[in-house]
Structures are given as structure tokens and as C-alpha cells.
Amino acid sequence: MKAVVLAVAVLFLTGSQARHFWQQDEPPQSSWDRVKDFATVYVDAVKDTGRDYVSQFETSALGKQLNLNLLENWDTLGSSVGRLQEQLGPVTQEFWDNLEKDTDWLRQEMNKDLEDVKTKVQPYLDQFQSKWQEEVARYRQKVEPLGAELREGARQKLQELQEKLAPVGEDLRDRMRQHVDTLRTKLAPYSDKMRDRLAERLAQLKDSATLAEYHTKATEHLKTFSEKAKPALEDLRQGVMPMLESFRVRLMSMIDEASKKLSAQ
């Protein structure tokens, strides 16, 4: 189970590099940058959405009657959450940095495997692209005379043109399917080979001392994280409790007033 967890982490760490390797797009972000970007977007969305709901409730009849000053409390809560993120951020970043360092050898081996597979597969991809371009050119040659015929003829020939185009399109579709099937057949052994190499790397990882070291470091990290999180969480709790207590007091007051009115009737 530990090997699976670490393997998933390694694949996550190497994921952007592999994508950049195949697509040759912009340089990949680090894993920690991706985590921070995702977390920032998610937390900001939650805070903005939550503040909208709080604002809507506070402007409602019930909200005005309760007079809870929810927006002010919400902003205070947001500040507490921000401080919590600032305090815990360095601890989490240190964990990711250590994980990347500890698994660097495995990522390098995986990148070598990808490079090897890409080198062997590239000729088949080039051949497929060439076949595709040939089929498109062949299709264009067949269609161009029909287009000229349509321009020269009247509208009544449109149906005839469609009938002539149908078999040409079907022929192109069938030929392209054959090329795709051929490519899939040629690439299958390399897919199996890559899967076997991954299994071999994971087996090496399982038998190495890195896994035990990682488990120890992860345990130490969680302990440190817990110790540093306690004061931040207490600060967060102190920010939330006044809001909850104010809500409870005002709600109980409303219930008492409603009970008195019912008793007086």
C-alpha cells in the first residue's frame, strides 16, 4: 500500500514533465506550484461564493431581524483562514521539496524510459501523419472535379453531387480507419513495454530503502504539521466562535419572543 501511495505521488510529480515531453509545450510548473495554484483558485472561489451567500442572507428580512453582522464576521474568518494558510504553507512546501528530492532518481529513470519509447515510436507517428496527409490530398483530388461540376451545373445537380460524394467520403473514412488500426497495432508492444518498465521501477522502489525513509519522513512531517497547525487552528476557532455565539444568542432571543407571543394569545 505504501508503494502505491508513493508511486502515485511520483507520477503526480512527473506528470507535467511527461506531458511537456510529448507535447513540447510551455515549460511545466513544479508540483508545489500546481498544488498552490489549484488551492488558491479553489479557496478564493469558496470565499467569494460564501461571501455572496452571506450578503444575500444579511440583506433578507430574517437577516436584518437577527442583525448578526455576518459580513464583518465573514471577513474576520477570511483573515483567520489566510493567516492559517501563511503559517502552514512553509511546512507543506518543505514536505513537497523533500518528496521531490527523495524521488528524483525514479523520475529520472521514468523520463529515460519515456525518451526511449518516444524514439522508437516516433517513426510510426511520422508514417501515420504522412499517410493521413496523403489520404487528405487524395480526397481533395477526387472532390475538386465534383466541385467544378457543381459550379458549372444547375441546382438540380446538387442531389447528384451528394450521391457522388457519399462513396468518396466513405472510402476516406474506411482507409483512415485502416491506418488508425495499423498504428494501434504497431504501438501496442511499446505500450506493453512501458507498462512493464513502470512495474519494474515500482518493484525497485518497493525493495529500496527510499520507501521506508519516506514513510519515516512523512510521519515526522505529519507530526510537525500537527504541532504547527494547533495554534493556527486555535486562532481560527477563536475567530469563528464569536460569530456562532452571537448567532445562538440572537436565535434564542427570537425563539423566546415567539414563545411569549404565542403564550399571550
From Swiss-Prot:
Record keywords: Cholesterol metabolism, Glycoprotein, HDL, Lipid metabolism, Lipid transport, Lipoprotein, Oxidation, Palmitate, Phosphoprotein, Repeat, Secreted, Signal, Steroid metabolism, Sterol metabolism, Transport
Matching InterPro entries: ApoA_E, Apolipoprotein_A1/A4/E
Source taxon at top rank: Eukaryota
A GO CC annotation given for this chain: spherical high-density lipoprotein particle
Mod. after translation: Glycosylated. Palmitoylated.
Sequence repeats: 68-89, 90-111, 112-122, 123-144, 145-166, 167-188, 189-208, 209-230, 231-241, 242-265
GO biological process, one term: positive regulation of cholesterol efflux
Secretion signal span: 1-18
Entry's localization field: Secreted
Main subcellular location: secreted
Gene Ontology molecular function: amyloid-beta binding; apolipoprotein A-I receptor binding; chemorepellent activity; cholesterol binding; cholesterol transfer activity; enzyme binding; heat shock protein binding; high-density lipoprotein particle binding
Covalent S-S links between cysteines: none
Region ranges (10 X approximate tandem repeats): 68-265
Methionine sulfoxide carried by residues: M110, M194, M241, M243
Similarity field: Belongs to the apolipoprotein A1/A4/E family.
Task of the protein: Participates in the reverse transport of cholesterol from tissues to the liver for excretion by promoting cholesterol efflux from tissues and by acting as a cofactor for the lecithin cholesterol acyltransferase (LCAT). As part of the SPAP complex, activates spermatozoa motility.
Subunit structure: Homodimer. Interacts with APOA1BP and CLU. Component of a sperm activating protein complex (SPAP), consisting of APOA1, an immunoglobulin heavy chain, an immunoglobulin light chain and albumin. Interacts with NDRG1. Interacts with SCGB3A2. Interacts with NAXE and YJEFN3.
Protein name: Apolipoprotein A-I
Species per Swiss-Prot/TrEMBL record: Microtus ochrogaster (Prairie vole)
